[in-house]
Amino acid sequence: MKSVGLITEYNPFHNGHQYHINQSKKLTNADVTIAIMSGNFVMRGEPAIYNKFTRAKMALSTADLVIELPATASLSSGDHFAELAVKVADYMSVDTIAFGSENNDIKTLKQLAHSINEIEQSESFSQKVKEGKSYPRIISELLEHHEALASPNNILGISYLKAIAKNAKNINAISIKRENAQHHDSLIQHHQFASGTSIRTSIISQDDHWHHVVPKDIQHLYVTPHITLNQIFPYLKYQIIAMTTDSLKNIYTVTEGFENRLKSNIYEATDFHHFVKLLKTKRYTYTHIQRLLMNVLLNIKPTDVTSNIHAVKVLAMNDRGRQYLKHLKTAFPERQYITNINKSNAHYFTNEIKATHIYNAISGQQQTDFNTPVIQQYR
């Protein structure tokens, strides 16, 4: 079976995602579409608006198979996120990865991926790091502000291409142009596509503008409980106050004395966004700081972070997904394709299980990795 992989967060699933899946399948003639999706915490450095089980159900309206991306990938830089996602795709024997971009010029993106690899090895790069500049700013400066780097999706696409070249040369890549909505649009316009940011804003504001930008047949899933950063803050504040400076120093992505900034600013902060502003320096982007804070909340240490895939968690599948999974289990009997977590296989998913428990403690939800079987759809 020919497969196409989509590296996603679906926070939440919307018409743009449906378009992306359908176009990916059409352009690759794939028999099966595999969504590799972030779990309960996402790359923006925040909890997903809906839990991973609800979002997997949403995705199954169009995708055939939904696989959970390791939690530490979702709370890492773009390059590590991409590297682990590509390794999951390779573990799933994906033929092609299809990603969204603003310019839809795969040749240019591949050239940029090659150029960035060279830049990262240069003395100029090392010098600018010492000057305290953020990674995105350094790359932008050394590539003379290439216009393709103005788009978050292009930047992430370049990270996928770098990861494929390094770890999975057997995987092809295609780029699909995003339709209408821009990544950071904060308001829903009057057309069928909208950004995830604007949809989350609409849902949290409890207006009904999101109705026309998500698939009609799954709209009932969008009225389930959701979670926000303000709900997270009291738990995060407790964690930072309770932890010693040395303990904070040992959290994944906490470097260069940032543990001291956490301790010295936590008492003044009135809410999550205020805290992030107090912590901001020219070296770190807001998103990097938010991911760091989620690592503090989840108590993720560098030793928890894997660079290899030893098992994957299947969140949802339909008939085609089941057929493909059966094919994989026959072709790769030594690999661990887990549909239901139990005591014998839970050690593969320690971070994901913990993230779900903490997400539930804050949101008051009850779905765990142990009591929620793989979501199945029969057609």
Curated annotation (Swiss-Prot):
Name used for this protein in its record: tRNA(Met) cytidine acetate ligase
Q: Where does ATP bind?
A: 7-20, 100, 153, 178
Q: Which EC class is this protein assigned?
A: ligase
Signal sequence segment: none
Q: So what does this thing catalyse?
A: cytidine(34) in elongator tRNA(Met) + acetate + ATP = N(4)-acetylcytidine(34) in elongator tRNA(Met) + AMP + diphosphate
Q: Which NCBIfam families match?
A: PRK13670.1
- This enzyme's EC code(s): 6.3.4.-
Which SUPFAM superfamilies does the entry link to?
Nucleotidylyl transferase (SSF52374)
Gene Ontology MF, one: ligase activity, forming carbon-nitrogen bonds
The disulfide bridges present are: none
Which cellular component appears as one GO term in the record?
A: cytoplasm
- According to the lineage, what is the superkingdom? Bacteria
Q: Where in the cell?
A: Cytoplasm
Q: Does the keyword Nucleotide-binding apply?
A: yes
Annotated organism of origin: Staphylococcus aureus (strain NCTC 8325 / PS 47)
| InterPro entries xref list | Rossmann-like_a/b/a_fold, tRNA(Met)_cyd_acetate_ligase
Entry's family note: Belongs to the TmcAL family.
Query: What function does the entry list?
Result: Catalyzes the formation of N(4)-acetylcytidine (ac(4)C) at the wobble position of elongator tRNA(Met), using acetate and ATP as substrates. First activates an acetate ion to form acetyladenylate (Ac-AMP) and then transfers the acetyl group to tRNA to form ac(4)C34.
Q: Does the keyword RNA-binding apply?
A: yes
Which terms are listed as keywords in the entry? ATP-binding, Cytoplasm, Ligase, Nucleotide-binding, RNA-binding, tRNA processing, tRNA-binding
Picking any one GO biological process from the record gives: tRNA modification
